[in-house]
């Protein structure tokens, strides 16, 4: 399980780097974004920011907020679908707690590497039997579809002509802002806390708690070295993530919980049974046998004494 957690944390870091830099190329001589993703998605976003900022006279700060909200609303169905799959996995874990808990307890109480391996295999087998993914039900396809949009808006917020010289609420958009960094960190931390809502499985809650600081920490670190225009995009993104989490917690999760319970009511699962780990043998002698043996010896000696 520890290796899976390390893999998940590493994947988050790599995914974040890919989101920010992997989808858009940057010209080494000019430092300007180029490539298919930028020309197809990023450049129109930059033009939209300029339109709201200059043509409508709203300023670059408000323009970044508007374009970010529009982009987030476009990809919101993908985010909801991704959360739907993860929530379905969570609800299955909650409903099958009585089936999986013995394996989880066995894994916690294992003392040797062999016992831990056997317990893990038994747990994974039970999860597979009931259609539960060991990776939490999160698919790669929705994430991959969202990445070009995240990358494009990231570069659009940073490289739109005129944004580096502008300001928003007295905050220069061309240099880092500690106020916006703090806001972004708090918002993503709140979103992480909201993701715990409705998760009843103890092991799953522990995994989420251990990763709860990763997203805010990564946002804060990147924001410290990014202009305020980019951090403003992350602040708005944090609000949208909280909105998405509320939709999942209070609309998606209740429906999925009802669906899972109805399915399990029709086809109730059987509690998993597992044998004791091989390698442990009970060498304690049976007490009744020992008592019977003593009685036989006593009767034999008594017969000898009478014959004498």
From Swiss-Prot:
Q: Mind listing the GO molecular function terms for this protein?
A: membrane insertase activity
Which GO terms of the cellular component aspect does the record hold?
plasma membrane
> Which residue ranges run through the membrane?
60-80, 135-155, 168-188, 211-226, 232-252
What Pfam families does the database record attribute to this sequence?
60KD_IMP
| Xref: PROSITE patterns | PROKAR_LIPOPROTEIN
Q: Does the keyword Membrane apply?
A: yes
Does the UniProt entry include the keyword Transmembrane?
A: yes
Keywords for this entry? Cell membrane, Chaperone, Lipoprotein, Membrane, Palmitate, Protein transport, Signal, Transmembrane, Transmembrane helix, Transport
Question: Where is this chain lipid-modified, annotation N-palmitoyl cysteine?
Answer: 23
Biological process terms from the Gene Ontology for this record are: protein insertion into membrane; protein transport
The biased composition feature labelled Basic residues covers 293-308
Q: List locations, semicolon-separated.
A: Cell membrane
Give start-end ranges for the coiled-coil region(s).
none
Residues lipid-modified (S-diacylglycerol cysteine): 23
Region annotated Disordered, chain positions: 263-308
At the top level of its lineage, which domain of life is listed?
A: Bacteria
Topology of this chain in the membrane: Multi-pass membrane protein
- Position of the signal peptide: 1-22
Role played: Required for the insertion and/or proper folding and/or complex formation of integral membrane proteins into the membrane. Involved in integration of membrane proteins that insert both dependently and independently of the Sec translocase complex, as well as at least some lipoproteins.
Family stated for the protein in its record = Belongs to the OXA1/ALB3/YidC family. Type 2 subfamily.
Q: What is this protein called?
A: Membrane protein insertase YidC 1
Source organism (scientific name): Streptococcus pneumoniae serotype 4 (strain ATCC BAA-334 / TIGR4)
Its encoding gene is what?
A: yidC1
């Amino acid at each position: 399980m520890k290796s899976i957690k390390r893999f998940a944390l590493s994947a988050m870091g790599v995914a974040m780097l890919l989101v920010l830099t992997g989808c858009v190329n940057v010209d080494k001589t000019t430092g300007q974004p180029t490539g298919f993703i930028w020309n197809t998605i990023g450049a129109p976003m930059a033009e939209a920011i300029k339109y709201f900022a200059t043509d409508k006279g709203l300023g670059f700060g408000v323009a970044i907020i508007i374009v970010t909200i529009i982009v987030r609303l476009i990809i919101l169905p993908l985010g909801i679908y991704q959360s739907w799959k993860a929530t379905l996995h969570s609800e299955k874990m909650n409903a099958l707690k009585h089936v999986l808990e013995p394996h989880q307890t066995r894994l916690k109480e294992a003392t040797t590497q062999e016992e831990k391996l056997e317990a893990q295999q038994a747990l994974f087998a039970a999860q597979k039997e009931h259609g539960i993914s060991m990776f939490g039900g999160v698919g790669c396809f929705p994430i991959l579809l969202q990445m070009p949009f995240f990358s494009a808006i990231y570069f659009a917020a940073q490289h739109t002509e005129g944004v580096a010289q502008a300001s928003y609420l007295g905050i220069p958009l061309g240099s880092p802002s500690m106020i916006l960094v703090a806001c972004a960190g708090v918002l993503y931390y709140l979103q992480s806390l909201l993701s715990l809502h409705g998760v009843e499985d103890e092991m799953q809650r522990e995994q989420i708690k251990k990763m709860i600081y990763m997203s805010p920490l990564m946002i804060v670190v990147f924001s410290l070295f990014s202009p305020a225009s980019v951090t403003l995009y992350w602040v708005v993104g944090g609000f949208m993530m909280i909105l998405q989490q509320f939709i999942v917690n209070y609309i998606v999760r209740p429906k999925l919980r009802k669906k899972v319970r109805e399915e399990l009511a029709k086809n109730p699962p059987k509690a998993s049974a597992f044998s004791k780990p091989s390698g442990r043998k009970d060498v304690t002698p049976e007490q009744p046998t020992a008592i019977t043996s003593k009685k036989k010896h006593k009767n034999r000696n008594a017969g000898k004494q009478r014959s004498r």
